[in-house]
Amino acid sequence: MLMVKKTIYVNPDSGQNRKVSDRGLTSRDRRRIARWEKRIAYALKNGVTPGFNAIDDGPEYKINEDPMDKVDKALATPFPRDVEKIEDEKYEDVMHRVVNHAHQRNPNKKWS
């Protein structure tokens, strides 16, 4: 496999009227270069330095990890076994029959 080093040319005109020949570049490379040129042109126009900028978020906040909070929350939430279950009435809706008879081979039974 032949490895070719590609040179990227910066054009502050946002990728318009490129003076450099694009020969030897794939369409993916040309799109990448155009995006990069637009990003650099925007950064130069708006005074943003290109590259990674770490923004200071201010002081760090500690998360309250008090175990008692977790215990209080656990005691306040009911267990599923403590909640009263509501029984579904059979044949209340049509879909019960559809699901109930869907395994039948006779298609007329699905809609009873």
Swiss-Prot record:
Biological processes, Gene Ontology terms: DNA-templated transcription termination; negative regulation of DNA-templated transcription, elongation
Organism per entry: Escherichia phage HK022
Name by which UniProt lists this protein: Transcription termination factor nun
Keywords from the named record: Transcription, Transcription regulation, Transcription termination
Keyword Transcription regulation: yes
Gene: nun
Keyword Transcription regulation applies: yes
